[in-house]
């Protein structure tokens, strides 16, 4: 705001246009639109602008324009004249005659004249959240809002033997550095208090004294240190690679990990150190070191999350945890929604979306696999073969969550299956042949398969001289002679005589035969045995 030009006096009610002459200016005042309180004898009462009509804090106060400032408005009242004997800027202007022994009135605090007209920020001015000032340097916490969310529930940080990165991590924006000077930036972690903490009844409480100082690294230097001020100010200063560990004897990547104790509260701090030429980096003087602390970055070191709210915040905001959650949900929710439920209890649940190239029927009836099961409904319409795999089909996997790519199956000729008679080998591009659903009717003894027999020949008349009572238990089942399926006879008598030939007991009077042991080849046993396999 500059000087009010003549003719614009109607801008402020009750004031006169400000003269453009040098009358009324205090001697020695700079011409940069800055005005001081005029001497009482320099002008009459009509030229004393303000006159209390605009609410001047004292009689005769004038509302004067002020240059643009960060803390004061465009118009401000000049300082009240001070009593004689004040050193500094007040001595340049003689006080009024009636100002001897003047004391500031109640409710008005006179500024220190030694500080000048604009001494600095007001006492009631507070820095915005997430901003810290040290000298000329200003540092802002970039993810301040995220840290504040965690701080409402007391932030927890996982520490492991291998080291775990912080989330939220520390990220800053720095301003006020000398572009050509070199600076070194690092973060250290210090204890907030001398207490041991425990999560109890849904909140963190103090329990006992903190343990002694644990040996280990407590400092993490930014990889870009040292560097120029222009380098630090043109980009984000991130400490995302900082890891926290509880391994006291950590030797690998010791410069990237900070050793902490579990169930202790810590406060990270940012250090900015100006590095002079020829000065070792380890030297840190108080004159060239600036420390910035943000209260919302306090955390408690834990080996496992204690508060469920913190766990949920980590899942919702951590990009790695969020990706894991999306993959987990897509693997299970997509299958449940895309594949319908079976239409009935007799249907077998097979994923048609995933296996449609191999199984054309999504819900095959179990009677197709077990035709003789009682209580199973028969298929009304004959279905085509489903055991033969079609050629030149790709496995269209739909597990997109695990990033699986479709794999093309080789088109090698499949083995013939003798179970279905008359099956034709499908050529590429050929249609599926229609065949009966059930296998052809087999003979009565088709269930029996030839087995290996002993190389022994029966003697002449062996089968006619022995009765059923002379039989004994066979040595093993593999010694039973095979029954030829092409014979029209059922083979019961022949099988009976051959089983008597291989009996280890030659007669019933032999003492080596077990007494009173029932023979497994009596008539009742034979009836039960052959009734199990109906013709």
Curated annotation (Swiss-Prot):
The modification Phosphoserine is found at residues 53, 225, 513. Residues 503-520 have a biased composition (Low complexity). One of its GO terms (biological process) is T-helper 1 cell lineage commitment. Phosphorylations at Ser-53, Tyr-77, Ser-225 and Ser-513 are regulated by mTORC1. Phosphorylation at Tyr-530 is essential for its interaction GATA3. Phosphorylation at Tyr-220, Tyr-266 and Tyr-305 enhances its transcriptional activator activity. Phosphorylation at Thr-303 is required for its interaction with NFATC2. Ubiquitinated at Lys-314, leading to its degradation by the proteasome. Ubiquitination is essential for controlling protein stability, binding to the T-box-binding element of the IFN-gamma promoter, and for interaction with NFATC2 through induction of phosphorylation at Thr-303. Deubiquitinated by USP10 leading to its stabilization. Signal peptide: none annotated. Residues 141-326 bind DNA. GO terms for cellular component: chromatin; neuronal cell body; nucleus. Residues 1-62, 83-109, 449-535 are annotated as: Disordered. Its main location: nucleus. The modification Phosphotyrosine is found at residues 77, 118, 220, 266, 305, 530. It is found in: Nucleus. There is a cross-link at residue 314 (Glycyl lysine isopeptide (Lys-Gly) (interchain with G-Cter in ubiquitin)). Keywords: Activator, Asthma, Disease variant, DNA-binding, Isopeptide bond, Nucleus, Phosphoprotein, Repressor, Transcription, Transcription regulation, Ubl conjugation. The modification Phosphothreonine is found at residue 303. The record marks 305 as: Essential for its interaction with RUNX1 and its ability to inhibit RUNX1 transcriptional activity and suppress TH17 lineage development. Interacts with RUNX1, RUNX3, ITK, ABL1, RELA, CDK9 and KDM6B. The phosphorylated form (at Thr-303) interacts with NFATC2. Interacts with SMARCA4 in a KDM6B-dependent manner. Interacts with CCTN1. Interacts with USP10. The phosphorylated form (at Tyr-530) interacts with GATA3. PANTHER family: T-BOX PROTEIN-RELATED, T-BOX TRANSCRIPTION FACTOR TBX21. It is linked to Asthma, with nasal polyps and aspirin intolerance: A condition consisting of asthma, aspirin sensitivity and nasal polyposis. Nasal polyposis is due to chronic inflammation of the paranasal sinus mucosa, leading to protrusion of edematous polyps into the nasal cavities. Immunodeficiency 88: An autosomal recessive disorder characterized by the development of disseminated mycobacterial disease following vaccination with BCG. Clinical features included fever, lymphadenopathy, and cutaneous eruption. Lineage-defining transcription factor which initiates Th1 lineage development from naive Th precursor cells both by activating Th1 genetic programs and by repressing the opposing Th2 and Th17 genetic programs. Activates transcription of a set of genes important for Th1 cell function, including those encoding IFN-gamma and the chemokine receptor CXCR3. Induces permissive chromatin accessibilty and CpG methylation in IFNG. This is T-box transcription factor TBX21. It comes from Homo sapiens (Human). The lineage of its organism: Eukaryota, Metazoa, Chordata, Craniata, Vertebrata.
């Amino acid at each position: 705001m500059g000087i009010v030009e003549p003719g614009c006096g109607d801008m402020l009610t009750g004031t006169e246009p400000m003269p453009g002459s040098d009358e009324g200016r205090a001697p020695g005042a700079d011409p940069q639109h800055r005005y001081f309180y005029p001497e009482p004898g320099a002008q009459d009462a009509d030229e004393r602008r303000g006159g209390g009509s605009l609410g001047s804090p004292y009689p005769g106060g004038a509302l004067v324009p002020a240059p643009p400032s960060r803390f004061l408005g465009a118009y401000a009242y000049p300082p009240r004249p001070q009593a004689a004997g004040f050193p500094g800027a007040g001595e340049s202007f003689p006080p009024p005659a009636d100002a001897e022994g003047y004391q500031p009135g109640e409710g008005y605090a006179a500024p220190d004249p030694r500080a000048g007209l604009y001494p600095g920020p007001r006492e009631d001015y507070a820095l915005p959240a997430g901003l810290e000032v040290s000298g000329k340097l200003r540092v802002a916490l970039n993810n301040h809002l995220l840290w504040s969310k965690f701080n409402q529930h007391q932030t927890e940080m996982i520490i492991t033997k291998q080291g775990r990165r912080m989330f939220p991590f520390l990220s800053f924006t720095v301003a006020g550095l000398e572009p050509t000077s070199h600076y070194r930036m690092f973060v250290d972690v210090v204890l907030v208090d001398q207490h041991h903490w425990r999560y109890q009844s849904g909140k963190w409480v103090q329990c006992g004294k903190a343990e002694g100082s644990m040996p280990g690294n407590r400092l993490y230097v930014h990889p870009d240190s040292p560097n120029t001020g222009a380098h630090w100010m043109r980009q984000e200063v991130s400490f995302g690679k900082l890891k926290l560990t509880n391994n006291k004897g950590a030797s690998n990547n010791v410069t990237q990990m900070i050793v902490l104790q579990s169930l202790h509260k810590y406060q990270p701090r940012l250090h900015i150190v100006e590095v002079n030429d020829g000065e070792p980096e380890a030297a840190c003087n108080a004159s060239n070191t600036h420390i910035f602390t943000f209260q919302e970055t306090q955390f408690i070191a834990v080996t496992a999350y204690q508060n469920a709210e913190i766990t949920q915040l980590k899942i919702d905001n951590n990009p790695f945890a969020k990706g894991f959650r999306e993959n987990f949900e897509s693997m299970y929710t997509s299958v449940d929604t895309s594949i319908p439920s079976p239409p009935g209890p007799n249907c077998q649940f097979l994923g048609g979306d995933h296996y449609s190239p191999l199984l054309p029927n999504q819900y095959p009836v179990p009677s197709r696999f077990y035709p003789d099961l009682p209580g199973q409904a028969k298929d009304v319409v004959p279905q085509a073969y489903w055991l033969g795999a079609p050629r030149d089909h790709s496995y269209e996997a739909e597990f997109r969550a695990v990033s699986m790519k479709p794999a093309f199956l080789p088109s090698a000729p499949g083995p013939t299956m003798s179970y279905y008679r008359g099956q034709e080998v499908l050529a590429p591009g050929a249609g599926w042949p229609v065949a009966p659903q059930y296998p052809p009717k087999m003979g009565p003894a088709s269930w029996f398969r030839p087995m290996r027999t002993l190389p022994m020949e029966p003697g002449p008349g062996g089968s006619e001289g022995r009765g059923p009572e002379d039989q004994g238990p066979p040595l093993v089942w593999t010694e039973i002679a095979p029954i030829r399926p092409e014979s029209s006879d059922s083979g019961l008598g022949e099988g009976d005589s051959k089983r008597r030939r291989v009996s280890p007991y030659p007669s019933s009077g032999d003492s080596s035969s077990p007494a009173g042991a029932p023979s497994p080849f009596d008539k009742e046993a034979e009836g039960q045995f052959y009734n199990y396999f109906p013709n």
